[in-house]
Amino acid sequence: DAVFSRQRYWGEPFPVYYVNGLPQMIAAQHLPIILPEVEKYLPTEDGLPPLGNATTWAWDSVQCSVVSNQLIDHKTIFPLELNTMPGWAGSSWYWMRYMDAQNENEFASQEALKYWESVDLYIGGSEHATGHLLYSRFWNKFLKDKGFAPTEEPFKKLINQGMILGMSAFV
């Protein structure tokens, strides 16, 4: 997905490996997938994203772990997705994590989400309208559709204080 996928190193890795060119999801119990160390954050010489430089970025479907690329046999060990999620993928639902920050089993319990519900007041500039607010609504609606978020909207009230365009006459 061109809107969501990034051809760079940073960002959350997609939990996807490929069998005969078809994407397969890594099961939730085997997450998170941690980005491997790489020496350079540039694309490969043949134009693959930076994760194409990683030497340990293959999925062992039997051991359910990330292994060396040299072990890829297309029978039980397969290549992992080389693109990553954009930076906003992990930062656009942060308020939900605050609701249950000590929870080590899920991003937040249903009890905490139902108790806290959505943010009472969000204050942000107009630059948020096509950035963070848009993505926050996307994630909230996605999580609501999947049964993880209790409310349709992430913020009850929004105050947009505007944007500074130039010098002020006030001292």
Language-model-detected regions and their locations in the chain:
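Structured secondary-structure scaffolds
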Residues: D1-V171
